[in-house]
Amino acid sequence: MKSKIFNTQEVQAILDGRKTQFREVIEDISIVKMIKCETSTPNDFSKYKTGDTVFVKETFLQKDARILFEITNVRVEKLQDISDEDCIKSGIYKTLDKSGCFSSYVFTVIRPIVIDDFIYTDYYCSEFEAYEELWNSKAKEDYKWEDNPYVFVYKFERVDR
C-alpha cells in the first residue's frame, strides 16, 4: 500500500470531510505530451492510480494507519486552472471572523498570530487566492504558483479499515 504525507491541518481537513483531492507536480513534461496526444492516460504515469488505497503517513506503522483513502480519479491540468470548487475540495473553506461577520476565505495552514488574546489569520477574497497561498507554502523551488506547472489531480474518498 502506498502512503501520502499531509500536514496537520490537511489531516484535520480530511477527517472533517473538507479535503477530498490533492495535486502533485508532474516534473517530466514529456508525460504531459503523451497524455495530450492520447497515447497514454494519467494513470499510466501517476504515482497513485485510480482504485489505489493509500494511507496517510503518520508516526505509526503502516499496519496501524488511522486514515485510509481510495483514489477515485486522476487527471492532468495546469496548476492555475484549478476551479473554485476544487479549491474547496482541496481544503480551503469559508469561515466567520471573531466579530461574527462573514469573512473571506482562509486556510488553516496559515499560522495565526496572537496579539492581546486576539487571533489574526490571513484572509483572502477568493478560494483561488487562498489556494495560491497554500500551494506556495508547500511548493518546491521552480514549482511555485507563478510557474504554473502541470499537475496530477487526485480525487479520493475516505475508506474504513
Which residue ranges define each predicted feature?
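Secondary-structure transition motif
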Residues: M1-R161
